[in-house]
C-alpha cells in the first residue's frame, strides 16, 4: 500500500468511512424494511402451500444475521480507514473483505424480495449498490497493481459466486426441510437437493475467504476460489438437470466461469505475482 499515492490512499479511506457509516446507520433500516415485506409475503405463501412452510423461518433467521454482519463490517470499515491511509499493507485485503459483505448480503436479501414481493423497488438493493460502488472504488483506486480489468473481473465473479452460494444453499435447505418424506431421500430431486444445498453453502464460505487472500496475493486464495467455484458447478449442474430450475443453472454457470477464469495462466500470474509456484 505504501507504493500507492497518498491521494489514492486518502480517497480510499474516505470511501471506507462513508460506506461504514452507511452500513452502520442507514443499512439496518433499509434491511428491516426488506425483511418485513419479504416475511409478510412468505407467511401468506406458506399458509396457502405447506411445502413453503420453512420459508418464513429461514428468512427470519438469515436476514437479521446479514443485517448484523453488515453493521459489524461497517464499524470495521471505519476502524481500518486510518491505518489504510498510512499505508498498512493488511488494510486493503481487509477493506475488500468488509465491502464485499453489503454487496453480497444485500443481494442475498434482494433475490427473495423480488421473487416474493416483486411490485416495489427492493430496499436491500440500495445496500447492494452502495456496497458495490465502494467495493469497485477500492479496487480501481489501487493503481499500483496494474491491469485493473483482471482484478475487477475476478473479484466480481468471487462476489457473484458467493452470493449464489448462499441463496442456493438456503433455498436447498428450505426445500429439503419442507418435503414431507424427509429425512428419507426419496427420488432423485430430493437427493440432489440434499447435496447441492450444503455444497453451495460451503462453496460460499470458500469463495468469500478467497477475496482477502487473493487481494493479499496469497496462493491459498487462488485454491479456495478454484475449489469453491468447481464445487458449486459440480453440485448444481446435476440439480438443474433434474429440477429444471433456472437458479441452479445460474449457480453452475457462475461457478464454471470463475473456475475457467482462475485457470487462465495470465490471470493466475496477475493475481499471485511472484507467488505463482
Kindly label every feature range from the protein language model.
Residues 1-277:
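Topology signature of small-to-medium multi-pass alpha-helical membrane proteins
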Amino acid at each position: 500500500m505504501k507504493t500507492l499515492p497518498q491521494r489514492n490512499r486518502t480517497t480510499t479511506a474516505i470511501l471506507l468511512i462513508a460506506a461504514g457509516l452507511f452500513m452502520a446507520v442507514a443499512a439496518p433500516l433499509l434491511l428491516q424494511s426488506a425483511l418485513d415485506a419479504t416475511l409478510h409475503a412468505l407467511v401468506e405463501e406458506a399458509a396457502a402451500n405447506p411445502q413453503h412452510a420453512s420459508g418464513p423461518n429461514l428468512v427470519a433467521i438469515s436476514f437479521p444475521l446479514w443485517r448484523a454482519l453488515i453493521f459489524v463490517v461497517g464499524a470495521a470499515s471505519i476502524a481500518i480507514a486510518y491505518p489504510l491511509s498510512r499505508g498498512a499493507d493488511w488494510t486493503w485485503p481487509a477493506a475488500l473483505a468488509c465491502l464485499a459483505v453489503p454487496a453480497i448480503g444485500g443481494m442475498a436479501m434482494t433475490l427473495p424480495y423480488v421473487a416474493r414481493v416483486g411490485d416495489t423497488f427492493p430496499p436491500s438493493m440500495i445496500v447492494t449498490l452502495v456496497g458495490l460502488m465502494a467495493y469497485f472504488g477500492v479496487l480501481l483506486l489501487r493503481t499500483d497493481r496494474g491491469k485493473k480489468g483482471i482484478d475487477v473481473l475476478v473479484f466480481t465473479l468471487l462476489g457473484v459466486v458467493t452470493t449464489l452460494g448462499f441463496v442456493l444453499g438456503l433455498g436447498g435447505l428450505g426445500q429439503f426441510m419442507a418435503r414431507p418424506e424427509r429425512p428419507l431421500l426419496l427420488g432423485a430431486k430430493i437427493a440432489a437437493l440434499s447435496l447441492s444445498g450444503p455444497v453451495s453453502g460451503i462453496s460460499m464460505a470458500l469463495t468469500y475467504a478467497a477475496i482477502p487472500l487473493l487481494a493479499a496475493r496469497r496462493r491459498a486464495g487462488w485454491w479456495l476460489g478454484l475449489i469453491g467455484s468447481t464445487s458449486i458447478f459440480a453440485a448444481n449442474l446435476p440439480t438443474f438437470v433434474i429440477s429444471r430450475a433456472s437458479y441452479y443453472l445460474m449457480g453452475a454457470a457462475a461457478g464454471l466461469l470463475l473456475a475457467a477464469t482462475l485457470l487462465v495462466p495470465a490471470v493466475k500470474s496477475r493475481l499471485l505475482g511472484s507467488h505463482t509456484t
